[in-house]
UniProtKB/Swiss-Prot annotation:
Species of origin: Candida tropicalis (Yeast)
Family membership: Belongs to the cytochrome P450 family.
One example GO MF annotation: heme binding
SUPFAM superfamilies: Cytochrome P450
Entry protein name: Cytochrome P450 52A7
CDD domains on file: CYP52
Localization per Swiss-Prot or TrEMBL: Membrane
Chief place of localization: membrane
Summary of the function given for this chain in its UniProt record: Together with an NADPH cytochrome P450 the enzyme system catalyzes the terminal hydroxylation as the first step in the assimilation of alkanes and fatty acids. Preferentially hydroxylates lauric acid.
Membrane topology: Single-pass membrane protein
Amino acid sequence: MIEQVLHYWYYVLPAFIIFHWIVSAIHTNSLRRKLGAKPFTHTQLDGFYGFKFGRDFLKAKRIGRQVDLINSRFPDDIDTFSSYTFGNHVIFTRDPENIKALLATQFNDFSLGGRIKFFKPLLGYGIFTLDGEGWKHSRAMLRPQFAREQLPMSPSLEPHFNVKAYPQEQRWVFDIQELFFRFTVDSATEFLFGESVNSLKSASIGCDEETELEERKKFAEAFNKAQEYISTRVALQQLYWFVNNSEFKECNEIVHKFTNYYVQKALDATPEELEKQSGYVFLYELVKQTRDPNVLRDHHSISLLAGRDTTAGLLSFAVFELARNPHIWAKLREDVESQFGLGEESRIEEITFESLKRCEYLKAVMNETLRLHPSVPRNARFALKDTTLPRGGGPDGKDPILVRKMSCSIFISGTQIDPKHYGKDAKLFRPERWFESSTRNLGWAYLPFNGGPRICLGQQFALTEAGYILVRLAQSFDTLELKPDTEYLTKISHLTMCLFGAFVKMD
């Protein structure tokens, strides 16, 4: 009996698969004709349904080379291709026209897909994880908190720029990214919660020791570790549920406990106390809009991620590039000297949002850093319906392609080093390019802070904070040097940060 059943399925199952493939192909061709699309110009097969590429990506992720791996899949003449990753059909693109469609002109055709499932254990429900009305409500709630009048200024930032924290002996080589992490978490927690965690006041970096809550000591490590797990969940796509071990859960609990401490403190404050609060406090303003502790916690976890990691990454790579290009560092110091003075003649009180905008070379340095090391090197969208993207089909890749409820991987990092947009020296750190006519109309070929309706609310906050620190470093130090034999900084995958730190000498 069993042999008869097996014999039956031996013929039926292959026949069903072939029949399904034929029907699917006919339907796909019909949709292409209906929507005016063409077959993909380029298709890359990476083992059985992309499991080989998925394995290679996870291996590259461990050594900080995942951005390089994806870049290697884009020869100069290919901007869009079809492939598979862990069984999921994915469109990879760095074409500005496709990116514009995904993020703006066809915004309603696409969603974040599985992001909520990947991110929820750490970040909950918020502006980074929600679609539709939930996202609109979250964005409307957060938008006023990043108004120009709330941007960080000298009085709020200077206490966190503790020059004593920067080893100043030539023989000292230290990880400046660690200091930038501490600076950004200090300034972010003061902005968000009304009080800084004062992580720069740590005996381990030569400053005054201070007693801290146990949660404060554990928070940064737990936050970093949880993000590593999140990035692996994203890489695994539909297999994300494999990554849910006890360490991941413990890290999430530590982060939530840290945030809940401040949320409860704000909820316990009376309306009169909230009104009398001196200075602007992000959390206290949100408490006026909602009393839901989970909503408050999720918004603050997401804001802390954005406020800490992206700015620290921008500063770390800016210093890395300046340290290996002494002539650019010298030119930046000249720009800073003309605007704010150097050394003992520094005019710190004059560093404002408006005055930083006048430092043209400083802006060029930050633009170039974000071009080569964008804070979010890759992004993704999922098609909500059968639709098209403008390019990637036909004999030359210029015709529309059909997108059938599938994932689209947006590779901003690849776009921003493409010679078609930035010339033959696209991979070279050269701030002067931002004074040339070729960079005046880049459009969707330069997206350091995303684009379309989801453009980053905190971009001016990040640029002001990073600009302030670069000015203060230029005022305080004559030279920057890299750790010997440092030619490349490995990167983590979820945001552009240095996997093993950024080691420099300063004098």
